[in-house]
Design a protein with these regions (language model features):
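Extended, folded cores of ATP/NTP-driven motor/assembly subunits in large transport
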Residues: 1-281
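Residue-level detector of conserved catalytic or cofactor/ligand-binding positions
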Residues: 280-290
Length: 290
């Protein structure tokens, strides 16, 4: 039976998907009713899509953190809030590994597990569900995170307008250089024409087609027992990224921030973001039953 499962590509790895959302508020009393409304909307949208979803309890969230920080640990997660009250320990004491080591800037160690945090340099015009499916089909320990922050519509339009102005200014400078050098002023670098056209189309989409703009960060957390296994996993992950016109880049000297941004706390400590529109993002949200 095990041989049959391995032949089918199912070696016991489990795929789970979480959505974490957050808002800015002065205190938890102000935030709680807003979060509850957002939660109800999200669950209702999943129901419409035919996807089963449920909110996690505090203990379930702690178990996810425990399994993330202790991927090779054989001892199951043991926790109760009564034990916290009786022992005087905090919740961190129940989920932390024996050690964290961030030494060389490109990898880190959690107990006996070695890991590497990377980000996706998005060169393609859109993200597709096929790319995400290939990452999730990898026969490796892998955490994929998509941090998506919506921009206020007026701020997004203002941002794109400033980019259009910058490109037009660069065009004028290039035309002046061409005139001084005796060249045709209509001959300017092709990149400027390309970027200028894309920026104008984006502005039109935001103003007249009800598109929204989002700042997106895609992170990958590979973990393994040995350095060689980790290198193989990172190489395989990078190969899939290249297939879809993207590039996997290591978070040099930001491994700790990459790790903490890869757990489902809704916290993004990585300042590397790519602006994408609704149409560019919608393809990665195909509903699946898992």
């Amino acid at each position: 039976m095990l041989k049959n499962q391995l032949a089918k590509g199912n070696n016991g790895l489990v795929r789970t998907k979480y959505i974490t959302f957050g808002i800015k508020a002065e205190n938890i009393r102000e935030a709680k009713p807003k979060l509850e409304r957002i939660e109800a909307d999200i669950l209702n949208n999943f129901k419409v899509l035919g996807v089963s979803a449920y909110p996690l309890s505090g203990e379930e969230r702690l178990q996810i953190l425990y399994e993330t920080f202790n991927p090779e640990e054989k001892v199951p997660f043991q926790f109760s809030y009564d034990r916290v009250l009786r022992s005087g320990m905090g919740t961190k004491d129940f989920i932390a590994p024996t050690s964290f080591v961030f030494r060389d800037g490109k990898t880190f160690q959690m107990g006996n597990t070695i890991g590497a945090a990377s980000y996706l340099q998005i060169l393609a015009p859109e993200l597709t569900d096929k790319m995400l499916a290939e990452f999730l089909d990898m026969d490796r320990n892998l955490i994929v995170n998509l941090h998506i922050q919506s921009l206020d519509q007026m701020k997004a339009i203002k941002l794109v307008k400033s980019k259009v102005t910058d490109i037009n200014r660069m065009k004028i400078e290039e035309q002046k250089k061409a005139v001084r050098s005796g060249y045709d002023m209509d001959i300017i670098p092709s990149d400027l024409n390309t970027y200028g056209g894309e920026a104008k189309r984006l502005l039109e989409d935001l103003q007249s087609r009800n598109e929204r703009m989002f700042l997106v960060t895609v992170l990958f957390l590979n973990t393994a027992k040995t350095k060689q296994e980790l290198d193989n996993a990172v190489f395989q992950t990078g190969g899939i990224a290249q297939k879809y016109n993207c590039s996997l880049r290591r978070l040099d000297y930001m491994q700790e921030q990459g790790l903490m941004s890869s757990v489902p706390l809704g916290l993004n400590l990585i300042p590397i973001k790519r602006a994408l529109t609704t149409l560019s993002l919608i393809h990665i949200s195909e509903p699946t039953r898992q």
